[in-house]
Every structure is written in structure tokens, then in C-alpha cells.
């Protein structure tokens, strides 16, 4: 993951700075390259049946070296690419403006936190009601209310702390988009259930008539796409591209997944759980 992040970021920096390419075209190329890298690795894993550890280890070493080649061992600054930097949350003023005034507390951020807490509470109650209606096992109302109170309090406290600073950072918008999109995909789509099924028991899934090779291929291609997005955010926040970016991202990603409830054997875990794991990893590394 880290090497692909570095490689895609290096390509983007060279295109925008050295070649003076249009920003939107450079972004498109970065997404395409990341997706193709994921597809390349997915092909060897899904169809040639080379162990994933071998393929990803080779990719980690290869793309780290290619990043060094692309950047020629130097740092490429993208400070002048202000639109790109601001779009991906790298500038000092990359925060959502306060639409309710310019006081010491960003009221827009507080309002957004209240809305998020209310939406979370409604979704939790609706989810429980749906389970009860369909006859599924559901947590009792007391535990549901307790969960809502605790998480809503965390959301409100977090939003208030942001409001005391500068408000909502624009990079947080990208994080929320990824959470919502992939939370929906994994929970409410057929493809998402296929991912869980293949992770839980590949043989049983294949005997059920599901093309497991295609599922593996799509999973790795998707990860290449996300690595490209991470590469853009990384170089935007650092306002430069360096051959050393992305080091140890692999361990951060693995640790975040396991802390967040995912299993090494597959088939379990949720997107919100992984986000919690990532937050804890970030706190540990401070």
C-alpha cells in the first residue's frame, strides 16, 4: 500500500510540476495508474494463484524503487499547485468556512456534529427496528440507547474540539465520503456480501456459484484505486512528493484492520470498525 501511495504521488507531482500538465488530467492519470496496479496484482493473485503475500511483497519493493526512479531521488514540491493542494486538504486554510459568522467557535462545525449525532441515532434505532420486525436477533433497547449515547457524545466532543480550532478540515470530507461509500457497499450490495463470503470461506463461496476469482480481482483493483486517492492526499498534505513517503503504511493498515475488528482469516469486520482502529493507531503513534 505505502509503495503504491508513494509511486502514484510521485507520478502526479512530476506530471503537474515538471510537465505542467492540467491538474484534472493528472488526477485522472493517477487514478488510472493506481487502479491498473491493483488490477495487475489482482490478476496474479486471482487467476495465476500466486500467494498474495508474495505478490504484494514484490509490489512493495518494485514500486518503492520506481518511485525513486521517477523522482530521481529528489523532492518535488507542489506548493505552487494551490488548487490541487486545497482540493485534497493540504493547505493551511483548507477548512470548511463558518457560514454562521466568524466567532471563536465555528458554529458550522458544531451544527454538523449535531446532525451527525442525530443521523447516527436514527440509523441505529431503525436498524434495530428492522431486525425485530424481520424476527432477527437484535440487541435490547438499553444497550442500543447506551451505544447511541456514548458514540453521540464522542461525535459532539470531537466536533466541538474542531470548532475551537478552525472547523472541519477539507480532508475530513474525503474520509467521510470513503466511509459512506464503502460502508454502503459492504453492507447493502451484492458485491459487498461477496467480499465477506470469499473472506470467510472461499471454497464454500465457489461451490455456491460465485466467481471467486473475479471477486479477488475486483478487491485488489479497488485497493489500487484507494491507494491512488491516498497518494493524492499524502502529497497534498506534505505539499511535495518524496521517495520515502508511505513507509510503514502497510503495518498501519494491518493494525487498523485488526484493532477495528477484522480477522486475519477474513469474513468479519466493518468499515466503521476499521476507522476506529485507524484513530487508535494514530493516537498510539503521536
Predicted regions and their residues:
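Hydrophobic alpha-helical transmembrane segments
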Residues: 3, 7, 24-32, 54-57, ...
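Alpha-helical transmembrane segments within multi-pass membrane transporters and channels
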Residues: 21-61, 276, 281
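Transmembrane alpha-helical segments in multi-pass inner-membrane proteins
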Residues: 28, 36-38, 220-233, 237-286
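Pore- or pathway-lining transmembrane helices of multi-pass membrane proteins that form conduits
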Residues: 48-69, 80-81, 174, 245-260, ...
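Transmembrane helix-bundle core of multi-pass membrane transporters
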Residues: 63-186, 243
Amino acid at each position: 500500500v505505502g509503495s503504491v501511495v508513494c509511486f502514484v504521488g510521485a507520478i502526479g507531482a512530476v506530471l503537474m510540476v515538471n510537465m505542467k500538465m492540467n491538474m484534472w488530467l493528472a488526477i485522472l492519470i493517477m487514478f488510472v495508474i493506481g487502479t491498473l496496479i491493483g488490477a495487475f496484482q489482482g490478476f496474479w493473485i486471482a487467476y495465476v494463484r500466486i500467494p498474495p503475500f508474495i505478490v504484494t511483497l514484490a509490489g512493495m519493493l518494485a514500486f518503492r524503487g520506481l518511485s525513486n526512479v521517477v523522482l530521481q531521488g529528489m523532492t518535488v514540491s507542489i506548493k505552487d499547485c494551490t488548487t490541487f493542494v486545497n482540493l485534497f486538504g493540504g493547505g493551511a486554510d483548507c477548512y470548511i468556512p463558518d457560514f454562521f459568522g466568524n466567532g471563536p467557535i465555528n458554529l458550522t462545525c458544531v451544527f454538523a456534529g449535531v446532525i451527525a449525532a442525530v443521523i447516527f441515532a436514527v440509523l441505529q434505532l431503525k436498524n434495530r427496528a428492522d431486525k425485530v420486525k424481520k424476527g432477527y436477533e437484535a440487541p435490547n433497547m438499553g444497550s442500543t440507547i447506551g451505544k447511541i449515547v456514548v458514540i453521540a457524545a464522542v461525535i459532539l466532543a470531537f466536533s466541538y474540539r474542531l470548532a475551537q480550532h478552525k472547523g472541519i478540515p477539507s480532508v475530513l470530507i474525503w474520509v467521510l465520503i470513503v466511509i459512506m461509500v464503502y460502508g454502503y457497499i459492504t453492507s447493502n450490495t451484492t458485491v459487498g456480501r461477496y467480499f465477506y463470503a470469499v473472506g470467510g470461506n472461499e471454497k464454500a463461496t465457489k461451490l455456491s456459484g460465485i466467481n471467486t476469482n473475479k471477486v479477488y480481482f475486483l478487491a485488489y483493483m479497488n485497493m489500487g484505486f484507494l491507494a491512488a486517492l491516498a497518494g493524492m492526499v499524502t502529497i497534498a498534505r506534505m505539499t511535495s512528493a518524496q521517495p520515502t513517503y508511505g513507509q510503514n503504511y502497510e503495518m498501519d493498515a494491518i493494525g487498523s484492520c485488526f484493532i477495528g475488528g477484522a480477522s486475519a482469516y477474513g469474513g468479519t469486520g466493518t468499515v466503521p470498525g476499521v476507522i476506529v482502529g485507524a484513530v487508535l493507531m494514530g493516537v498510539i503513534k503521536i
